[in-house]
Amino acid sequence: MELTEEITNEANGKRLSMKLSVIIVNYNVKYYVDQCIRSVLRALPPVMPAEIIVVDNHSGDGSVEYLSARYPKAEYPMLRIISSERNLGFARANNIAIRQSKGEYVLLLNPDTIVGEHVLEESIRFMDAHQDGGALGVKMLGVEGNAAMESRRGLPSPLVAFYKMMGFCRRWPKSRVFGHYYMGYLPWDEPAQIEVVSGAYCLLRKAALDKVGLLDEDFFMYGEDIDLSYRVLKGGYHNYYLPVSILHYKGESTEKSSFRYVHVFYEAMLIFFRKHYSGMSLFFSFPIKVAIYAKASVALMGMMSERVRKSLGFFVKGDVRPQRFVFVGTQGMLDACREIADKFCLEAEYVKLGAEESGAEGSMTESLGADCLEDLKVEAESDKLCNVVFDADAISYEAMLDWMQRNPRKLVQLGTYCQALGKIIVCRDVLG
């Protein structure tokens, strides 16, 4: 069966095979997934035949109708929306799209991410040059500009998992023995072979998927990326880390303070353990299982205590943290954000940058590069969250991410505004 679709390149009349299929599973985060799609459209090279497949997991926020209106088929023929009648979970929803995909490569991408303008091109170029590569991950940044440890992970063998759950990984992060779970001994700015690629950005060679199989649907939401990465390695491929940056809000699709989250997360650990290490002796397996159940119990008790404390009216510093907003962009963006700030009574500052207004959707008549933010200074406050909201119509996503990486500070977080959405998007909040 042919896995690639022939497409005509209008520039030279040649027939090109579908190179990339981007798959995004959405659940109740329509503005975040819209922002994600916009970043993907910017990052797709014009000469690269590609498709974007969004699987909506029965969202209740009108995501399907919203995205269908924002991206009409006539204007965006490369984008397809698959609407599920129930929440299928991450693995099953991705598998539906993978089966329909036509690309040489498949990119699994979280909806709460932003990709830099050259990330896709560099990722594909690296995989083309490394035919032994089955999967590739990138440097994921949190909203405060710090690199996420989940960007490079080792396989959670019983011993590695035990070291992590006992805190040894945190105590000795650069140790090749105790710190193997996050592979903290690897440099951040160099490509490297890793063992586990995060499902938030996982570029897969379609041929590797054909060989090792799709995501295991026994995993509802967590652990499927670890399982797939392990099977890719066992299939004779290597998994790679590439130091190009994306933003990962990390959890906008998930309420991590819920009892259901704890159950699903730790159940995934047990599924992986039973699947790949079921033959291990009781002497070794029992401590691991005890540690998993203990961690889950501690997490549940902590959440119960937190809910009881809040229900009784007891709050500690940080429960409700004041915020300020620093808007950085062109005059048109600042005027629009001023209206929103006045509407929501936000404490706001405004920094004007010189740039022309944006052009067509997904493009900019003048994109400000990283040097446009060289002189941007934002003061951090110890008791107040600062949202630095960038003009996404005038400033490249790469420039935003570069500034955040150069200025990582606690309580200083990245936000965006674009005219087409008319919304201020920050971590865990959308205003407009």
For every predicted segment, state its role.
Residues 106:
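Short aromatic/hydrophobic "clamp" motif used to bind/position activated sugar donors
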Residues 81-101, 122:
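Glycine-rich, basic loop-to-helix element that forms the pyrophosphate-binding segment
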Residues 155-194:
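Short, flexible, basic/aromatic active-site loop/helix in glycosyltransferases
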Residues 114-150:
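Conserved donor NDP-sugar-binding/catalytic core segment of glycosyltransferases
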Residues 230-308:
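Active-site-adjacent helix/loop segment of glycosyltransferases
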Residues 187-190, 195-245, 403-404:
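A short, conserved alpha-helix in the catalytic core of glycosyltransferases
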Residues 29-44:
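Short, well-formed alpha-helical segments that are part of the catalytic scaffolds
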Residues 39, 56-65, 86:
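A conserved acidic beta->alpha catalytic loop
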